Amino acid sequence: METWWKDAVIYQIYPRSFKDTTGNGIGDLKGIISKIDYIADLGVDAIWLSPIFTSPMQDMGYDVSNHRDIDPIFGNLKIFDQLIKKSHKNNIKVIIDQVLSHTSDQHPFFILSRSNKTNPKKDWYVWADAKSDGSPPNNWLSIFGGSAWEWDTSRKQYYLHNFLKSQPDLNFHNKMVQKWVLSIIKFWLEKGVDGFRLDTANYFFHDKKLRNNPALSNKKINSNPYYQQELKYSINQKENLIFMKALRKVTNRYKDIVMIGEIADPKVQAEYTSDNNKLHMAYSFELLKENFSNTLIQNTVLDFFKNSKNGWPCWSFSNHDVPRHVSRWSNSKIHEHNFAKLTCAILLSLKGTPCLYQGEELGQTQTEIEYDEIKDPPGKKFWPIDFGRDGCRTPMVWNKKEKNAGFSNCAPWLPIKKQQLKNAVEPQTCLLYTSPSPRDLST
């Protein structure tokens, strides 16, 4: 059973949008529990939950202010225990997102760290003095736009944030930070989880010398300047691999645990999954790209196993960060429903572990979000060039005849639109009823 994950089908749940039981328009843990039978009927082996921890929700839970508790909008630790119990009773393993490279700026540690330069958490985050002209320490950029450095008036220093300014990066060069992060992993293992999906797994360490990132040789202008730098010094540091080994040692003390790392660069994936002493799997971005072709899929799979001697990939066509693939890869010559079945069959036939995103089993399409409906920070910043991620995060369509499609008895946090009602669990429009189950296809 130690490699159960190699034969598994994983089902990703975005809790905010799965099922609301409290009447606030936001999905919750009880909602997931209420649908475990549905998930079991799909034939999947594990669920992966996007962040459910205490958070101000500036980035929908990826800004964590307490890594050891459940945000009240989702429930509490007691309800989480119930979710683990019911999932395991149905032979479904539970994998949870872990956001470890940074915290929320509302985390007690950061509040203390920014207060002065002498406090106990003074170097738990990445602080640096301004240049002589007052500008940031280097040219590093945030993936969400602008400089990766934010000036703090209390400490009179800049702090690093690879993402939103409300998501300050932890200083992993500090051994106490490493010890604290390992204790978080132990906490959730003791709660009975079966694995972790490590968000931005190659972002933990930064170059101590804070050297400038070089420009990419490709002169093509991107709508987001972040992608015009070679991220040589801001991420992918050698110390990161050493820490992955420390994480693996912790998980190895428990039975049948899997550790999946979110890593965009295929070459880096090979490093992180080699030698059976770091990540168990790399969550690949290569098949989340804009254009669909048999060449893309063939080359991606072949390249992974060519570069990674004994690594193992986790493949997805859709997730909570990219437009749904049925729309992203749309072709007017192919009916959407048929295309959804085709791509599902392809995903489940690839060597590696497939990960289905909620609604993918329905052939769900991307929701068109108007500007005044946008909740996602990058969507607001880069619109209309980039519409953000809300379109793939709209609520699950359970029954097209019920109020709010059976998701909630009040207005949902993101709209459910007519186009998406066509792909509902009830009546039986699910791909589940028109093709073999994911479990059958992957074996």
Give residue spans per PLM region.
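Active-site and adjacent substrate-binding regions of carbohydrate-active enzymes
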Residues: 1-435, 439
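N-terminal low-complexity segments that are often proline-rich with Ser/Thr-Pro
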Residues: 441-443
